[in-house]
Amino acid sequence: MSQSILYKIANPYADALLELSLLNNAMDKASSDLSMILEVISKSADLKLFLSNPLVEDNLKKNVLNQLFKDKVSDFIVKFLMVLVDRRRISMLHLIIDKYFSLVYKTESTILTEVITAIDLTEEQEIALINKIKVMTKGKNVKLITTIDQTLIGGFIVRIGSKVIDASLSGKLKQIAFYLETN
C-alpha cells in the first residue's frame, strides 16, 4: 500500500487516540506511554513481526500486549491497543502514533523540526537553534528531532514542514558543482 493510503487509514485512529487522551485529561501521560510502547516494539524485531503477522490469532496478540503493557501504561491505551488488534490495524501502530504526535504538537502549538547534522549538537547549540526557529516561525514550542548523517561533512540541514534550510558543507559543495556545470 502507498504511504498516503496508510496515513489516511491511520488518521481516524490517531484522532480518536488524541480525543481519548484529552477526555481522560492525560495527554502527557498518553504521550509518554506511547513513546515507551514505540521504544519497546522498535527494539524487538520479533515482536514487530509477531504483531504484523496476519496468521497469528488476535487473542494471542492481545495476551502478549496485555502482558507487556497492562501495568505500565494507562488503561485507555491498553484498550486502544486491543481495538487495533480487533480491527487488524496493530501493524500500523507506528504510523498511528506518529500521526498522534503530529496532532499533539499541533494542539500544543509545537513546531516539529527535523535537524540532520554531521555530529551531535551540544546543548547550547540546540538551545540556540530552538530560539532561532521560534523567531523564524513565531512558534511557542519547538520539538527537535535530531539525526546524525556523516555524509554532510559539516553543518546541518533543518526541515520545518515543507521548508528545508541546507547549511551543510555537502550542500554547499553541490551548489558550487551545479554552478560550475551550468556556467
Curated annotation (Swiss-Prot):
Name any one Pfam family assigned in the record.
OSCP
Does Plastid show up as a keyword for this record?
yes
Give the UniProt keywords, A-Z: ATP synthesis, CF(1), Chloroplast, Hydrogen ion transport, Ion transport, Membrane, Plastid, Thylakoid, Transport
Q: How does it sit in the membrane?
A: Peripheral membrane protein
The compartments listed are:
Plastid, Chloroplast thylakoid membrane
Q: Which GO terms describe its cellular component?
A: chloroplast thylakoid membrane; proton-transporting ATP synthase complex
UniProt main location, coarse: plastid
- Alphabetized SUPFAM superfamilies for the sequence: N-terminal domain of the delta subunit of the F1F0-ATP synthase
- InterPro entries per record: ATP_synth_OSCP/delta_N_sf, ATPase_OSCP/d_CS, ATPase_OSCP/dsu
Q: Which family does it belong to?
A: Belongs to the ATPase delta chain family.
* UniProt cross-references to NCBIfam families, sorted A to Z: ATP_synt_delta
HAMAP family from the xrefs? ATP_synth_delta_bact
Which protein, by its recorded name, is this?
ATP synthase subunit delta, chloroplastic
Name the source organism: Antithamnion sp. (Red alga)
Encoding gene per record:
atpD
